[in-house]
């Protein structure tokens, strides 16, 4: 199974990569894995040693900027979970909660302690230096295994290609045994791991040691089978395995990469017994048995004779992207005939500096001959892959690749190896600045002639066409017409890529009801800023900068999305709760205002008055915006809180109620205070709710994840303490391990946050007057009676308030989200989309020769010249900024009689009656699954019998032509029909 990356794996020379996955196979070096984790008891020590966010940024930045170059053979690279890495980045950007310990469990096979297979760089993991790794583990602790990795050279000494070996090959070892008892052993095979740059001699020594072989008299078989092997196997079972080959011991000095053994595979060791190989003896015995049944065997062989061209390709480890493209290409009749007849040898160009010395053409010819040999049911293209990888390091390892990118590289390599031009002349492509049919035709012919002066091969004859591009200046209407060759035609799919979500908007005006706003944005790469502007327009908010975007979870803030232009909406999943709060005024960096998150809990009266461990969340949190003057007045803070609470209850005079006793007596009007609340009221009066304060010195706007409400100080007590006492953060805000289940189990991780309080930092005189400072969070604790009276679900008295927490007005979008509509898309629709006029973006303007300025010109594409073999690349994968997506919609395409005549510019302008451009389908390259984990297969029509077959790596089955039209179709191969 393959995962797909729209771009090729990056290659790094010398400098350490930010993340690199040149190797991507099923296991990791088990000798390098050490299980390290941190207990809850260790968390306190870690959090005390954690520097401030600014200090962390500085220290990590210095290490990254001064990191050394990659050194061959050094194990100084570490694989880091990308999901934890993103949480860290969000935390350091003050955009998310504390990330918890370095959590590797999502990328680790916890049963074996190894790295999970098929992981993708920059999606599943990133790679950091040892120094950065050590720093992160010291600061945050470690949860799960660590994965140190070695630097290897996948190039040559003269042209080094240093990479981090993410997946060193692991070899499963099976011993061939003639002992009936041993041969029936069902234990799993033993395994050894080596670097891909180890030699064959290193491998042989490892096999001998691991299997405890008594002597050097053994030989090694490489086996490709879908059936799992056990620790031992008997000779009769072994010879039934179709795909196996003996490893040549004469090449002991060659590396595993050079031998094509740099991916994990199964090896069978066979020891000589009495100077006889057990496999040879078993084969002779099998031959004698077949001789006895010669006649029936001949009949069976006649019936089972394989059709040439129906040979599968073994998956060498994430190579189905290559296998599917090869099956499509090798079923091109003209290409097959050219290479099987050895005609290619007369045209190979070994001196072309842009070519591969004829090596790609040679290995491709060998591959085609193997695939069309009736002897093979399946073939392992190891040497082919090794040759391709030598010229393009992206395909050297076993990482996930794009089938279209591989095909483009292979066709270009074959073209240059077969280029009939030995001395390429200098040419200059003409441009046309007027719309004149005759001049357009002449310019197109000249462009093709010049192209052929430098590029002339069978590949050009078969696969290359030409398209016309027309640009029009929006200011002066200057027209520019150019012609360029293509090998395949990339077609956009006419599918709307929309982002839709229903969010909750809390107005600043407490007399207004919260709004549930349906958001539909016509770009999956839209930003938080796009969302805020949309909500501001729909809600009537005068200034979108006054809106604070948050994600909530179970009554708490999970993160604050303050990076408006940088954060993508696609980072928000369908189930995420998004709340947008309108502030009184814009809140920007440098503002004297502070934002204080407010949580609400109701006390269970069945517990003692001094215990807050049984408190429970209710409602949803909100945010108070307080100015410099407002944070010094406890009565003002209380009044402001009550005013905000009034937005969520039908009790509209809540701001005038000052105590629990006033509610119990039911004389609300008599209890109205004419002035502000006296903080030093009679202690016999129980306040409507108590304000408790939590501080986090690391988060500008704290989320309070994993905080305990036990022992939180009252806001008024904080005032009396003069805010100068130093409080041990973990003593004051410790994690309760017994009863506070409502707060412990809802968080993403189970580790405490670091240093929640002032940590030995005394406040200045100005700060000394404040009751609240930056990094504070309020927890309003409502006694049960207050809670029931103000936020009753079913009020028993007219004087009681009914809860409005769950009530909101709905605003539907005027844009319909039809992204899930089942409208049929055809190939013609895609061609229409390709031909549509579009405006260039701000980032890629065109220089107008008349205006002498860069302009966002209009651009239209048109096929001008159709090739004999027409390959359509359906653009199912999109990439905008950090977001990548796949379109899985079905595109219906014709199996026969695709008419391209009226879509081809040269045909439309031709004066004579040329034969129509009619095409028939002969191959389809399919991709199933998404970007994070998919698989390639192919449908191909046999050139001899006209039967379509499905090629799923080594498995080959016949199919009906209609079965080739699926939503997985990625590359379509058409051949022009001739008279």
Swiss-Prot record:
Coiled coil location: none
InterPro entries xrefs: DUSP-like_sf, Papain-like_cys_pep_sf, Pept_C19_DUSP, Peptidase_C19_UCH, Ub_carboxyl-term_hydrolase, USP_CS, USP_dom
Domain (DUSP) ranges: 51-152
Active-site positions on this chain: 320 (nucleophile), 935 (proton acceptor)
Chain intervals with Polar residues compositional bias: 1-12
Reaction catalysis annotation: Thiol-dependent hydrolysis of ester, thioester, amide, peptide and isopeptide bonds formed by the C-terminal Gly of ubiquitin (a 76-residue protein attached to proteins as an intracellular targeting signal)
EC category: hydrolase
Gene3D superfamilies, A to Z: Cysteine proteinases, DUSP-like
An example Gene Ontology CC term for this record: cytoplasm
Protein name (Swiss-Prot/TrEMBL): Probable ubiquitin carboxyl-terminal hydrolase 12
Phylogenetic placement of the source organism: Eukaryota, Fungi, Dikarya, Ascomycota, Taphrinomycotina
């Amino acid at each position: 199974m393959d995962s797909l990356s729209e771009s090729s794996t990056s290659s790094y020379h010398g400098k350490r990569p930010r993340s690199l996955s040149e190797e991507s196979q099923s296991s990791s070096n088990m000798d390098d894995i050490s299980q390290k984790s941190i207990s809850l008891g260790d968390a306190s020590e870690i959090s005390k040693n954690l520097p401030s966010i600014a200090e962390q940024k500085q220290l990590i930045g210095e290490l990254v900027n001064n990191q050394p170059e990659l050194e061959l053979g050094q194990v100084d690279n570490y694989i880091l979970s990308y999901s934890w890495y993103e949480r860290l980045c969000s935390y350091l950007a003050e955009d998310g909660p504390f990330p918890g310990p370095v959590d590797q469990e999502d990328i680790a096979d916890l049963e074996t302690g190894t790295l999970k297979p098929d992981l993708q760089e920059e999606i599943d993991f990133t790679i950091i230096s040892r120094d950065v790794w050590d720093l992160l583990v010291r600061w945050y602790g470690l949860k799960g295994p660590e994965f140190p990795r070695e630097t290897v050279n996948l190039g040559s000494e003269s042209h080094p290609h240093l990479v981090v070996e993410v997946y060193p090959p692991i070899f499963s070892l099976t011993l061939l045994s003639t002992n009936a008892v041993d041969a029936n052993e069902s234990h799993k095979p033993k395994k050894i791991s080596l670097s891909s740059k180890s030699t064959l001699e290193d491998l042989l020594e490892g096999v001998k040691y691991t299997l405890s072989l008594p002597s050097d008299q053994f030989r090694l078989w490489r086996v490709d089978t879908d059936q799992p092997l056990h620790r031992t196997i008997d000779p009769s079972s072994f010879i039934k395995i179709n795909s196996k080959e003996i490893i040549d011991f004469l090449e002991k000095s060659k590396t595993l990469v050079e031998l094509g053994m740099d991916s994990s595979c199964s090896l069978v060791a066979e020891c000589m017994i009495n100077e006889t190989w057990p496999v040879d003896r078993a084969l002779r015995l099998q031959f004698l048995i077949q001789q006895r049944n010669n006649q029936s065997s001949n009949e069976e062989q006649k019936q089972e004779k394989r059709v040439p061209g129906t040979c599968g390709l073994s998956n060498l480890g994430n190579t189905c992207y290559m296998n599917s493209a090869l099956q499509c290409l090798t079923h091109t009749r003209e290409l097959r005939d050219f290479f099987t007849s050895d005609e290619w040898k007369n045209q190979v160009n070994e001196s072309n500096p842009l070519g591969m010395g004829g090596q790609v053409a040679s290995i491709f010819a060998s591959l085609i001959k193997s695939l069309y040999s009736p002897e093979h049911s399946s073939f392992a293209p190891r040497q082919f892959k090794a040759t391709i990888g030598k010229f393009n390091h992206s395909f050297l390892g076993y990482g996930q690749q794009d089938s279209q990118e591989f095909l483009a590289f292979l066709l270009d390599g074959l073209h240059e190896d077969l280029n009939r031009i030995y001395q390429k002349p200098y040419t200059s492509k003409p441009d046309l600045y007027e719309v004149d049919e005759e001049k357009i035709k002449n310019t197109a012919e000249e462009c093709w002639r010049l192209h052929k002066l430098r590029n002339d091969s069978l590949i050009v004859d078969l696969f290359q066409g030409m398209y016309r591009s027309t640009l029009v200046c929006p200011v002066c209407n200057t027209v520019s017409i150019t012609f360029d060759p293509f090998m395949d035609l990339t077609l956009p799919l006419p599918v709307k890529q929309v982002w839709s979500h229903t969010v909750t908007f809390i107005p600043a005006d407490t007399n207004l009801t919260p709004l549930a706003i349906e958001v539909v944005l016509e770009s999956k790469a839209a930003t938080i800023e796009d969302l805020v502007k949309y909500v501001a327009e729909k809600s009537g908010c005068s200034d979108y900068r006054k809106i604070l975007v948050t994600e909530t979870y179970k009554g708490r803030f999970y993160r604050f999305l303050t990076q408006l232009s940088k954060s993508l909406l696609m980072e928000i999943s369908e189930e995420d709760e998004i709340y947008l709060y309108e502030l009184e005024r814009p809140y920007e960096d440098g503002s004297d205002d502070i934002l204080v998150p407010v949580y609400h809990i109701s006390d269970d009266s069945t517990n003692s008055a001094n215990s807050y461990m049984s408190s429970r969340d209710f409602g949803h949190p909100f945010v108070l915006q307080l100015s410099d003057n407002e944070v010094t007045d406890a009565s003002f803070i209380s009044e402001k809180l009550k005013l905000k609470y009034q937005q969520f209850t039908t009790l509209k005079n809540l701001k005038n109620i000052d105590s629990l006793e006033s509610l119990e007596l039911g004389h609300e009007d008599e209890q109205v205070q004419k002035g502000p609340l006296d903080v030093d009221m009679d202690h016999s009066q129980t306040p409507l709710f108590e304000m408790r304060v939590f501080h986090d010195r690391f988060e500008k706007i704290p989320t309070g994840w994993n905080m305990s409400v036990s022992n939180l100080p009252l806001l008024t007590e904080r005032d009396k303490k003069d805010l100068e006492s130093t409080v041990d953060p973990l003593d004051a805000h410790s994690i309760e391990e017994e009863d506070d289940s409502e707060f412990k189990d809802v968080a993403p991780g189970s580790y405490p946050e670091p240093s929640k309080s002032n940590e030995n930092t005394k406040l200045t005189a100005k700060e000394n007057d404040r009751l609240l400072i930056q990094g504070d969070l309020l927890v309003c604790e409502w006694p049960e009676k207050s809670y029931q009276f103000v936020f009753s679900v079913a009020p028993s008295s007219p004087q009681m308030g009914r809860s409005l927490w769950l009530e909101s007005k709905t605003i539907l979008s005027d844009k319909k989200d039809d992204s899930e509509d089942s409208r049929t898309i055809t190939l013609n629709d895609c061609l229409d989309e390709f031909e549509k006029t579009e405006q260039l973006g701000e980032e890629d303007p065109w220089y107008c020769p008349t205006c002498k300025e860069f302009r966002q010109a209009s651009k239209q594409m048109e096929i001008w010249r159709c090739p004999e073999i027409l390959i359509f690349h359906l653009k199912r994968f999109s990439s905008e900024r950090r977001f990548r997506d796949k379109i899985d919609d079905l595109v219906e395409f014709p199996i026969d009689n695709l008419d391209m005549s009226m879509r081809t510019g040269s045909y439309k302008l031709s004066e004579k009656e040329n034969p129509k451009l009619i095409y028939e389908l002969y191959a389809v390259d399919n991709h199933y699954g998404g970007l994070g984990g998919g698989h390639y297969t192919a449908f191909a029509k046999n050139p001899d019998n006209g039967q379509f077959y499905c090629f799923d790596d080594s498995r080959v089955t016949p199919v009906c032509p209609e079965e080739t039209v699926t939503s997985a179709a990625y590359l379509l191969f058409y051949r022009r029909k001739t008279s």
